[in-house]
């Protein structure tokens, strides 16, 4: 028992000494704690305007996020042989002196994201960081970076640089033979040139989504044979060269959604035998070339939703057909005999749904799965609109049913048509009576009789007008 106790005391001494050393050199505005591989120093949200002058020698991780740091001088962190992670995100850095990170020989992760005033980096900014594996430069509003900025980072595996102002893929990427992941989202990149990714033979994931890419040059990804995920969605691509993706035989995900593509060419995907996810959604596609998907037998999902497709030919998938999911919703489908194969495949596989018909009129609004394709006497498929025409009995076209508004308008126009006013009719009648009776009846009694006759005649006219209105309503 005594031996075990002595053993525990002996082995706990290094841990106790390391903890004491960590706490002894901890900056006043920071908190320090001992971790497995050294000391963790947290100085985030401490209101710091400059980097503390001293850190624990055993520091393995330093967090200086969300302070007010503006400038990093040379050897800004002294000599910290055990430091592996340094985070300076969300500060106000505007300048980093060349050699600022000297004295950090084991640094593997450097985070400089969200320093919007940085804008520029000297070619020697990251000198002496030979073991750096992860570099985060996101949201620094960088316009450009020197061609050899990353040349002294042979171990770099992951580069995050989204939300910048590059306009083109930085030439600093060339020759980064060990880089595996690169993120350039929302960086206003306008084109992917043929030489911008030279030497990147281990690159597995490249994200260029939400940029302004209008052109991808032929062979642009020629040196990226290990690429598995390529994201080009939400750009301005209207077309692609035939050899745009040539050589990407390991590609598993290709996202071209949210562009301006009007058609899908057969040559685009000829080398992508390992492709599993293909996104062509939210384009303006109206035509898919025959055999466009013929080599994609390993697809798990094909997204064609949100386009302008009216028909999709079986020949687009020949000679084989994939067994994955097919997304076709939000297209103006014409559900005639050209889509009978798709209806049959929907019933048999259950891997596609929500194919709403926009035409012909007899099936508009229905789902393709509900459309019944009849057969002619020769056994040929009959389009729904043709079926509707040939089976209808000939006869005169029925008159359109009048609506309440049309009936009222018609009646009103008839009532308002020019007619002799009742007063004019009465006056005319009175004049006629006067002419005919003027010579023989001139007594007061005769005049009274004429007044009564006029009243009677006027009443008859009004009664006739009322009958005309009633008959008009009945006919309408």
Swiss-Prot record:
GO BP annotation list: visual perception
InterPro entries named among the record's database cross-references: Cys-rich_flank_reg_C, Leu-rich_rpt, Leu-rich_rpt_typical-subtyp, LRR_dom_sf, LRR_TM_domain-containing, LRRNT
Highest taxon above the source species: Eukaryota
Subcellular location: Secreted, Extracellular space, Extracellular matrix
Cellular-component GO terms for this entry: extracellular region
Glycosylation site residues: 92, 178, 295, 388, 427, 434, 438
Coiled-coil segments: none
Tissue: Expressed abundantly in retina with lower levels in brain, lung, spleen and testis. Not detected in kidney, heart or liver. In the retina, highest expression found in the inner nuclear layer and ganglion cell layer.
SMART domains: LRR_TYP, LRRCT, LRRNT
LRR repeats: 58-79, 82-103, 106-128, 131-154, 155-177, 178-199, 202-223, 226-247, 250-271, 274-295, 298-319
SUPFAM superfamilies: L domain-like
All residue ranges annotated as the LRRNT domain in the record: 19-57
This protein's UniProt keywords: Extracellular matrix, Glycoprotein, Leucine-rich repeat, Proteoglycan, Repeat, Secreted, Sensory transduction, Signal, Vision
Stored Gene3D superfamilies: Ribonuclease Inhibitor
Family, as annotated: Belongs to the small leucine-rich proteoglycan (SLRP) family. SLRP class IV subfamily.
Disease per UniProt entry: Defects in Nyx are the cause of the nob (no b-wave) phenotype which is characterized by a decreased sensitivity to light and an absence of the rod b-wave in electroretinograms. An 85-bp deletion in exon 3 results in the loss of 288 residues from the C-terminus of the protein.
Name this protein carries in UniProt: Nyctalopin
Native organism: Mus musculus
Encoding gene (name): Nyx
């Amino acid at each position: 028992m005594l031996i075990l106790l002595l053993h525990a005391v002996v082995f706990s001494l290094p841990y106790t000494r390391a903890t004491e050393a960590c706490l002894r050199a901890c900056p006043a505005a920071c908190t320090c704690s001992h971790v497995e591989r050294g000391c963790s120093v947290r100085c985030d949200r401490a209101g710091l305007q400059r980097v503390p002058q001293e850190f624990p020698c055993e520091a393995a991780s330093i967090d200086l996020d969300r302070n007010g740091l503006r400038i990093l001088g040379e050897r800004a962190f002294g000599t910290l042989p055990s430091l592996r992670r340094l985070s300076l995100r969300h500060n106000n850095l505007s300048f980093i002196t060349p050699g600022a990170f000297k004295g950090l020989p084991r640094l593997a992760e450097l985070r400089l994201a969200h320093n919007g005033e940085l804008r520029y980096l000297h070619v020697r900014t990251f000198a002496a960081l030979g073991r750096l594996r992860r570099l985060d430069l996101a949201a620094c509003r960088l316009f450009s970076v020197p061609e050899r900025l990353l040349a002294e980072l042979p171990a770099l595996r992951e580069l995050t640089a989204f939300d910048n102002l590059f306009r083109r893929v930085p030439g600093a990427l060339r020759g980064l033979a060990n880089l595996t992941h690169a993120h350039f989202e929302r960086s206003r990149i306008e084109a992917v040139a043929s030489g911008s990714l030279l030497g990147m033979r281990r690159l597995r994931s490249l994200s260029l989504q939400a940029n302004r890419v209008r052109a991808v040059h032929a062979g642009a990804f020629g040196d990226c044979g290990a690429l598995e995920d390529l994201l080009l969605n939400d750009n301005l691509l209207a077309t692609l060269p035939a050899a745009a993706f040539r050589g990407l035989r390991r590609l598993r995900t290709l996202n071209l959604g949210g562009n301006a593509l009007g058609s899908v060419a057969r040559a685009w995907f000829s080398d992508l035998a390992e492709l599993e996810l293909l996104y062509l959604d939210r384009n303006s596609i109206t035509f898919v070339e025959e055999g466009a998907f013929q080599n994609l037998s390993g697809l798990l999902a094909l997204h064609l939703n949100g386009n302008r497709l009216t028909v999709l030919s079986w020949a687009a998938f020949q000679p084989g057909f994939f067994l994955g999911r097919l997304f076709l919703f939000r297209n103006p489908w014409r559900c005639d005999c050209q889509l009978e194969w798709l209806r049959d495949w929907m019933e048999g596989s259950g891997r596609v749904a929500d194919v709403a018909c926009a035409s012909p009129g007899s099936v508009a609004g229905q789902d393709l799965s509900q459309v019944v394709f009849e057969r002619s006497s020769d056994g040929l498929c009959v389009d729904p609109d043709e079926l509707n025409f040939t089976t209808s009995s000939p006869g005169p076209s029925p008159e359109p049913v009048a609506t309440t508004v049309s009936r009222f308008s018609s009646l009103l126009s008839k009532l308002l048509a020019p007619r002799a006013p009742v007063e004019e009719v009465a006056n005319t009648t009175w004049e006629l009576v006067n002419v005919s009776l003027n010579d023989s009846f001139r007594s007061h009694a005769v005049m009274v009789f004429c007044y009564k006759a006029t009243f009677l005649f006027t009443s008859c006219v009004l009664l006739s007008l009322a009958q005309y209105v009633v008959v008009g309503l009945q006919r309408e």
